[in-house]
Structures are given as structure tokens and as C-alpha cells.
């Protein structure tokens, strides 16, 4: 799924759409996405000048966006908004810097009605960069 198709599912737009491609989707179960981390990312000018590092919370947001693609691919949730409700047990294992390609893997581990939990892992190559639980709710239809 390319960037245009992702925008057909998620309402996020530049500069806050943090997923460039979705490589795999199992509706309601899991998705795998990719973020090509460019030296031109808006956040690098201040995080940190001279030693750019992708903020960990934005890695988690990217994982949440990939999870939202899996969730909103279910027929009953199409056209709705996925709301990021929180994070638990988050760990940052490796810095993500310009030139890295992030592989974003998010699994939906619990779904009850329109509320649930996912688990996300972000990799650079085979190296784990970040992981944690993602809490979410599915909102109303987007008009």
C-alpha cells in the first residue's frame, strides 16, 4: 500500500503522516509498515542540532498509525477515526537517525467493541529500535 492509499485510510497528513508504505495488512489483526527517515524531517532541526535523532514518541506514533491501518481495514471500522489512547511498557533500544529505514510492526492483541490494545515493534534492519503497548479507541465516522 503506497502513501496515497494510506491517506485513503488515515486522516493524517504532512507533516504528521509518519508511514511511507504499508507492506502487509491482516485486517483487525496486524500490519507492517515502513518509514524512510530522511535528513529533511521537520523534527531534526531541533532534536538535536548537529546530532539528529528521531524522537521516540514519534516512533510510537508511527507504530500507532500502522496499527490504525490494520484496525480501520475492518469493514465495520472503515471511514472511522482511530484514536491513540496511550502507551505502556515502552522501551527505546536504539537511536533512529537520518538514512535509517524503520520497519514498523503492530499487532492488535485485544479488541473489545471499539476499544483495544496493540503491541508495536520498530526495527532498523534486524535491530529492535523501540517497542511497547499501544492503547486505542475507534471514534465516529469521519465526514
Swiss-Prot record:
The active site is at 47. Keywords: Cytoplasm, Lipid A biosynthesis, Lipid biosynthesis, Lipid metabolism, Lyase. GO terms for molecular function: (3R)-hydroxyacyl-[acyl-carrier-protein] dehydratase activity. It is an enzyme of class 4 (lyase). It is found in: Cytoplasm. PANTHER family: 3-HYDROXYACYL-[ACYL-CARRIER-PROTEIN] DEHYDRATASE. This is 3-hydroxyacyl-[acyl-carrier-protein] dehydratase FabZ. It comes from Moorella thermoacetica (strain ATCC 39073 / JCM 9320). The gene is fabZ.
Amino acid at each position: 500500500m503506497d502513501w496515497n492509499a494510506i491517506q485513503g485510510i488515515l486522516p493524517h497528513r504532512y507533516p504528521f503522516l509518519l508511514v511511507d508504505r504499508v507492506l502487509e495488512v491482516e485486517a483487525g489483526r496486524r500490519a507492517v509498515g515502513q518509514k524512510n527517515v530522511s535528513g529533511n524531517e521537520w523534527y531534526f532541526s531541533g532534536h538535536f542540532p548537529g546530532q539528529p535523532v528521531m524522537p521516540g514518541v514519534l516512533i510510537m506514533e508511527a507504530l500507532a498509525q500502522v496499527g490504525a491501518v490494520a484496525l480501520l481495514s475492518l469493514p465495520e471500522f472503515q471511514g472511522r477515526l482511530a484514536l491513540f489512547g496511550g502507551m505502556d511498557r515502552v522501551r527505546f533500544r536504539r537511536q533512529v537517525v537520518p538514512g535509517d529505514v524503520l520497519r514498523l510492526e503492530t499487532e492488535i492483541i485485544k479488541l473489545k467493541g471499539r476499544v483495544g490494545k496493540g503491541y508495536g515493534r520498530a526495527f532498523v534492519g534486524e535491530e529492535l529500535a523501540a517497542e511497547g503497548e499501544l492503547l486505542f479507541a475507534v471514534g465516529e465516522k469521519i465526514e
